[in-house]
Amino acid sequence: MGEVAATVEPLAAVKSKSMRSRKRRQRRRRQIAYLAICGLSVAIFGFALATLIRPTTAQADADPGSWRKGYVGHGTTHEQLGQPHWPPVQYTVYRPTTNYTKAPPPPTSAMNPIFNFTHFLYDKVLYRDEPIPEGYIVVKNSDTLSLGPKVEENDWRDLLAHYWMVLIWVVILVVLIIVIPFIAVCYCCFCCCRRCRQGCPPCTSKQDAQRRFCCGICLLILIIGLIFGIIIAFVTNKMIDSGFAETSETMKRGSEDTCTYLKDVADHVHHLMMYNYEEMETHVLDQLTHAHRHIFLDLSDTSESNSLAEMERVLENMPEALELMRQVEKMEKDLRFYGSQLRDGVRGIKRDVNFAVANLCQLQMCQKFLISSNIEHIDSSQCLHFDNLPNTKEFVEGMENIVASEYYAIPQRGLSRLKKVSDKVKTQLSFVVPPMMRDLTKGRTIFREHATNVRNIVEGVLSDIHIKTLHSTKSFEDVYERFGHDRNVVSLIVCLLILLVLFILIFALLCGCFGRRRTGYGDECCSKSTGATCLLLAILLIFCVFSFIALVGLFYFMLGMVTYQGACAPLRDQENNTLFRQLDASIDLNHYLPPSESNKEVVQPLKMSSAIKACHANQTIFDMMRQHNIYDINDLTRIKVMSHSQENTDSIKVFDEDLSTVVLLTKEERDELKTAGESKLAKYHSSLYMPSLCTQFTPMNLNALSEQLYKLSNDLEYPAYGWAKVSFWNEGLNTKAFYRNFVPKLTSLVEKMKANLKKIDELISYENHDFTNTIKILTATAINSEQFIQTRGKDYINALGGNLTNSIDQMIDDYIDMIIKEANESVGHCAPLSYIYYRGVDLICHRIVDPINGFWVGILLCALLFLPILFVAHRLMCLYKKIYPYLATVGAAGVVEGGSDYLYDAYSERDREHVPLANVPKKRRKAYERRREQQDYFEDASPSVSRGNRSGGDRGGGGGDGAPGSSSMRYNDMAPTHWDHEPPRYHNPPAAPPSSEYERPPPYYYPGASEQD
């Protein structure tokens, strides 16, 4: 059972393998069948495609667009060189010669930060979207700004209500203007200027010095602020005067520059629309006038009928070539004669040298010379063998036969027949060209009208802008008329008052800093007492002028704010400023412009703001006018100069003659040309002569060979080789003689023959062919040209005529495009216009309004600085008025701090001075030294001398309270009532017993020279 199962399993495996192989074969058959079907489908598709392509190919072959094999376009030679078929117009470029007037130097730039501050104040702090209330700025004659009636009436209620921050500021100033005079009255009536607490000057000396220093620094800072304010006031006041004075000059410059700008625009437009059109017209008229010649030449070039002209050139040059060939024949004979003589001569030299080497000189030197000199091949040069030269006589006979037969008349007759085709072309074009010329003349009139219209429009726009500029320079003239005369006087008074206060304060500060302290004993000039007096004077003067100065500053502040909102703010914020929108609405330029015939509708008004914006963008005047529908230069593209451009140019036929009967060469003429090509001249070409026409007649230079022979002769010994020596010497002479007599002649003959042959080739050859091929090629080309003219000449001429009309239309379109491009990019840039306009605006805003605002900044700055100056000056005045006595007693009059019995030491606050006499003036120091010599200044300090004796000796006698024996002597002021410039003496108390020991004296008070704090 197991064996049967083992046998069944292999059989099943074999059966499964056979089934798989059968399936693979079936799959392969299906793939082959599928590929066969696909291949058959591709073959059928290819056959069908071939049948479709064949007619298309035939049509392409018949397409007249390929006029000449291997050439593109119309088959002309100049087109293959990259040159246009009809050359374009070369326009001259406009060169401006404008010179604008020079603007005056700008105002000082040192005030720019002040002006920028006022701009920031008005633009950022006080900025409002709503315009200023009515009645403060009015528009006169729709173009000039002036102050309104509310300014004349000093009615500022609406303005202050509109700007609440301005209201607060004005209220503060008004309160100060009113209150300060009352404070001044109280200050003077209650004697505040004299109520300065003295205190204890010796006790508070150090603190007083510190207070003086701090107050002095504060006053110095305030004085610097005053200086800054007065400088601003003076400079801006001068700028206001200059701004009002430059009005007429600025108007004159603006008029001149506007005229210059207008002339430049007009000249540029005239150059584009008149001068450049005339250039284009002249160019097109020239092409139309010579169009028949151009078309005929292109027809000759494409049909290759120029071969007749080449044939005529070849045959007409035959007599000249004949003369040259006869010269070549004569030179050939001379060449053969002289060449044979030279050849025979060098052969004799070779024979004699070989004989001498073989028989007369068997030395190694002679054998070596024979080998190295190459003399064995001296006569083997091809240039000496003229057997290969052609027979020139046959060429001469062939030329004579051609000249005698007058073959040159054949191409001349063909050219005369071809000229009839040119006459037909000229006749046909005479019906087409005159209308084109009339259209060009009419186009010149059209562009002249457009140039005049454009000039009028531009002149109207510029005139209006210039008028607005001139009127804008008159803005706020009423400011000068109303305040101009008194304003300058008032401003000058204010500046002088501030300057007076400034000088007094500076002088007071200098006296207080460098003057002596007040002592109460006859103070000198320029001391601190003088400084206190000057400060008091400054305080009183400030009280007197503060209200006046602040009132003037307030007036300028209000005036500057109103004028700024009318002149500068509109230019600052043209989009958002409502006042400018209100003013801009009344400035319309359209009523100055000429009426537009092409646009009968009411165009949108051109605003000054739009003009300014265009100038900012550096646009041209044509861009600005196009954007506002005044004039669009792009409308020139609608102009149709040529009337035929309205039609289909493909249907235009400029030539309608039958050229099928044109014959260039008859059958007889062709036979004659064939006979001429097969004459004796048939094989002529200069290349037949060139292999034999060379100048290397010998392998070596004969002169060099003669020198070698001389050298060899000199090297041989005599008399052993005497005959060889003589032989070599003679051969050297012969070699030199042959070179001198034959080589130059032969060389000259060869060069002349080459030149003649080259000239003959140029005369009777075509494209470097020999004569027979030249005649054959030119004849065949003429025959093909004849067939081209007969079959395709008419279509070719019409194609060139259509190309001419298209080229003229393209030239006119290019001209119009050039005008539009130049007008939009180069004509009338707004930069000069902006320059002209902003010079007028500069007169108002930057030269009048800004200085007004700068003036109130300087004035109010000084006025506000007066307030802290009052306080600081009063404090400093009290410090300067303190009296510092020489001695301060201790006891009944007042005990010093700590209850010390010693007197007050004046040097406690003088750390920097240890020697009292250091600061004593020179006069007093000398007087003191003289008195010291007279008195015993250095007393005996020994114990034997009692203090009482010493003091008694110094003091002398005396009575009263000051006597030495007085009981109250200790509490009396020991200093003299009048200081005599001597150090004070110190005494023992009356009750003190005499002491034999040395005792240190108590501190003493010695004022010395007055300190300068």
From Swiss-Prot:
Protein name: Prominin-like protein
Signal sequence region: none
UniProt topology in membrane: Multi-pass membrane protein
InterPro entries: Prominin
Transmembrane segment boundaries: 32-52, 215-235, 489-509, 535-555, 852-872
PANTHER family: PROMININ PROM PROTEIN, PROMININ-LIKE PROTEIN
Location(s), subcellular: Membrane
A GO biological process held by the record: microvillus organization
Keyword Glycoprotein: yes
Keyword presence, Repeat: no
Entry keywords, A to Z: Glycoprotein, Membrane, Transmembrane, Transmembrane helix
Residue ranges, compositional bias (Gly residues): 950-963
Cellular-component GO terms for this entry: apical plasma membrane
Family: Belongs to the prominin family.
Pfam families the record matches: Prominin
Positions annotated with a glycan in the UniProt record: N99, N116, N576, N618, N803, N824, N949
Region annotated Disordered, chain positions: 918-1013
